[in-house]
Amino acid sequence: KTVEYTVETENVAEYIINVPEGWHADYADNTLAITAPAKDLCHFDKEGTVAITVVSESGKMAIVKVNVFAGEWVNEVELRILTFEDADCNGEEIGDGIYAWSEFIPTGGQYGNGHGSYWWGDYGNTEIEFTPVYGMYGAYGGHAGISNYVGSDWQNEGNFSFDLQAYNVTGGHSGTNFNTYFGYLDESGYGMMESLPPFYFWDGEARVIDHMWVTNTTYFYNQAHSAGFGSDYVISDESTFKIVAYGYESDDDTEPTVAEFYLLNVGQNFVTEWTKWDLSVLGKVTRVEFNCVGSDDMYGSYGMSVPGYFAYDDVAVQFPGETVFR
């Protein structure tokens, strides 16, 4: 970009203009034009000094300096993060009579105890809201719940009564709490619900979900090794299990964008720690639905023979930040 300055001169015999590398400057007809290097020429100096040495007709010399800086106005992105930590609650109701995330966590055993049947919202922060999906099994058709249960004894603590337990971690990704997800659809007719449990922006505004952190649950880790309900499934080096995210820009959107994350990859490679999942590839969305999909060997006469669970935390959403020149 070129910036022009009006400069009135008199009695100038000659002048020399020195510029930083990559810059250009010219003077003609009382106009000083300074041109910054192109944006893609980042190896040139972004800032420096244009020095103009002027010699008068009487032989006197003066140096005029102009400090220059090349940049652009940039709309920065603010990342707001849903942490599920009580310290980040703002005093507003986030559930039915609930004001802190830990109040959702059952203390009398993980399975049952009302989990899976409640709504929640991260109001005034990410604006993400969740309502349960009621399928053929009622509230247990989709969604598990807020949790702080963790463990690594997958052989003894890997059945359905430990369904809120994240595997092999010491807590949430950045704190104590996290969320657990349950839900899947398949073509067997024995899926747990008629639609997938989504979370969405309650105000209908389309936003970019930048990323979230995911890991396996102890329940899935156990069952992936030993499950066989309705099938002859035995884990092999070819077995896989993934989360598929579907992003919808509006309620009328019938062609969602898609992102995938493998919780179990070939070679019996399980995710056993909090791992970042880039969801920005979905673009701007008003809601996201998640499905759990196994490899063909995980399906039998009653559909998927392993539990469609995963744990997630620290959901980051992009919001407009400050406009800065840089």
PLM feature segments, named:
Residues K1-P20, F69:
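Solvent-exposed, low-complexity, repeat-rich "mucin-like" stalks and linkers
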Residues N11-T31, M212:
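Short, solvent-exposed loop/linker segments at beta-strand-coil boundaries, enriched for Pro/Gly
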Residues T31-T49:
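Extracellular/luminal low-complexity segments enriched in Ser/Thr/Pro
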